[in-house]
Amino acid sequence: MRTATQRRPRRDRTKRLTNKRMNDAVYAERRKVMHHVYEARDLLRSVGIDMPRVQIRICERDPHILGVARLGGDLAIWISESVINMGERHLRHTVFHELAHTLFQAPHKRGCPLMRPFHPCRPDLKQGERVFLELAKAYHS
């Protein structure tokens, strides 16, 4: 139990990445991420699954971490600025990967095109969509 002087820990932070302050440039980066979140939402709707609200955070560049997802409770993903600058194909792959973690509690899997722990050189978007839908159907069945 907390006393009156203890604060509830902030839930919009992660130990691994530092959130960027919102300004016009960060807002534009966030819109790019949101575009892919909406794509995932529409993809799930096409098979009759409603996607809950997911918080999106843009973080400082990190050479080793492209994204982080919160599992359970408040749904949130953190996307590193470095993956946003890699291009749309890599950004979409990373967003779908992190959404699969936070929405379906999907673990990393070496042979899986979407859920492998290392980022592929050239992600296959159609294969990623197929795996994303398979994970969604398995989670909701």
Model-derived features with residue positions:
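Surface-exposed, interaction-prone regions with an acidic/low-complexity signature
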Residues: 13
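Metalloprotease/metallohydrolase-associated module, dominated by Zn2+-dependent proteases
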Residues: 2-5, 10, 18-19, 23-82, ...
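Active-site recognition of the HExxH zinc-binding catalytic motif
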Residues: 93-105
